[in-house]
């Protein structure tokens, strides 16, 4: 009998990455005047940039053999593929096809990351994606 007995314990595991990207908040559904009113300086035609931070949290049972919910090396590789390769040092609006049809708000960046990770992670493992556009502007997305 293990130290935990027959009880299968669950845990959440989080990993943080940082990436730099530029974008412009602009909706083709709005006039130029409405875009300026809604998005303010973030509607600058030349765009602007951020040093984003992303915390990805997975959850599951702690494996009784490895003692892990997920191998951190695997999580790092999933995040490299879903976040760093497509987003780091990119213009989100021009370089990431997803944002051809979606305004590149932090909310939509979080959804994009969630959807990208869902394709790579084991089913049911992804718990939440937390995107820091700045230290003060943060979006949490749980696939809802």
Curated annotation (Swiss-Prot):
Phylogenetic placement of the source organism: Eukaryota, Metazoa, Chordata, Craniata, Vertebrata
Signal sequence coordinates: none
Name the UniProt record assigns to this protein: 6-pyruvoyl tetrahydrobiopterin synthase
Assembly with partners or alone: Homodimer. Homohexamer formed of two homotrimers in a head to head fashion.
GO cellular component assignments: cytosol; mitochondrion
Family: Belongs to the PTPS family.
Keyword 4Fe-4S carried by entry: no
Cofactor note: Binds 1 zinc ion per subunit.
Function: Involved in the biosynthesis of tetrahydrobiopterin, an essential cofactor of aromatic amino acid hydroxylases. Catalyzes the transformation of 7,8-dihydroneopterin triphosphate into 6-pyruvoyl tetrahydropterin.
Catalytic class of the enzyme: lyase
Post-translational modification: Phosphorylation of Ser-18 is required for maximal enzyme activity.
Keywords: Lyase, Metal-binding, Phosphoprotein, Tetrahydrobiopterin biosynthesis, Zinc
Modified residues (Phosphoserine): 18, 27
Alphabetized GO MF terms: 6-pyruvoyltetrahydropterin synthase activity; identical protein binding; metal ion binding
Additional comment: The active site is at the interface between 2 subunits. The proton acceptor Cys is on one subunit, and the charge relay system is on the other subunit.
């Amino acid at each position: 009998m293990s130290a935990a007995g027959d009880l299968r314990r669950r845990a959440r595991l989080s990993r943080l990455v940082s990436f730099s990207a530029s974008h412009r908040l602009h909706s083709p559904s709005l006039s130029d005047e409405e875009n300026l009113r809604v998005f303010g300086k973030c509607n600058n035609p030349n765009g602007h940039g951020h040093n984003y931070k992303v915390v990805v949290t997975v959850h599951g049972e702690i494996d009784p053999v490895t003692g892990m919910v997920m191998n951190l090396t695997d999580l790092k590789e999933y995040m490299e593929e879903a976040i760093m390769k497509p987003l780091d040092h990119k213009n989100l609006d021009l370089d990431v096809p997803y944002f051809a049809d979606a305004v590149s708000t932090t909310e939509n960046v979080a959804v994009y990351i969630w959807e990208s990770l869902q394709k790579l992670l084991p089913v049911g493992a992804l718990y939440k994606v937390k995107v820091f556009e700045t230290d003060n502007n943060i979006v949490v997305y749980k696939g809802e």
